[in-house]
């Protein structure tokens, strides 16, 4: 889930009181009503690198209260070191988070043994908190290897993983999904991006994914879920193609490295423009980028609005039905 930032203040290095907590609560509520079965906070578009400790705790509290135990909330526990992660998790537990959305320290790439020990330390310190792995090989400077997945699968609190994607807007990325799935042996759900869902479902009967797109247009995601769980991969491909159309121009022609450089402002602009979640702008230092990246985000957001019409989400249909009833009564 993206972190909603206020639009009525200047966003610069002096910005204070930046969070729109009312919108955060509303966003969590509509995501659940429109089909989300879990909420992960403070990933890339959740402003993990640009929020203060106090802001992250305030956001988590607002979302947990809004969710009210309807689905699990995984709070953003990624920090630069083990001790800061422990401090953050203690605060998350106090506000009622169900689990942790947890990458790993990234100032320097971690060795296999260090990765395993990091997760083991947190799991042993907080045996009552579920862990959702965050395997982003760009953010954390390397992927989790098959051998490490086999060791992490021995930690019972680790229940799922945001697995690195096989396709990003049509661009293939090296992956080892089949071997990693065999290594975890059903003990960790390795969740792919929605574009890859048909692959993980067809080969391993995977019944869930991670999705940023649900924060822009939940209708296509739920339509894809219905198609894939019914094993109608042809229909799922039509939906995926529509989603890729909505993302045209968002991925720089210069390649994936340039995508990562400006993805936070571009995607927050897209999400906000889509109109589903009023997520506002990115926070410093990620609030600046070449103007064409903001333009690409706005263009994709406008296409997301077209996707709302083709694949209306549940709360949209309910609102339209209520409006018709009011019109008829009048």
Region locations from a protein language model:
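Active-site beta->alpha loop and helix N-cap motifs at the rims of alpha/beta catalytic domains
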Residues: 2-143, 284-287, 308-327
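Secondary-structure boundary/capping signal
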Residues: 71-72, 130, 160, 188, ...
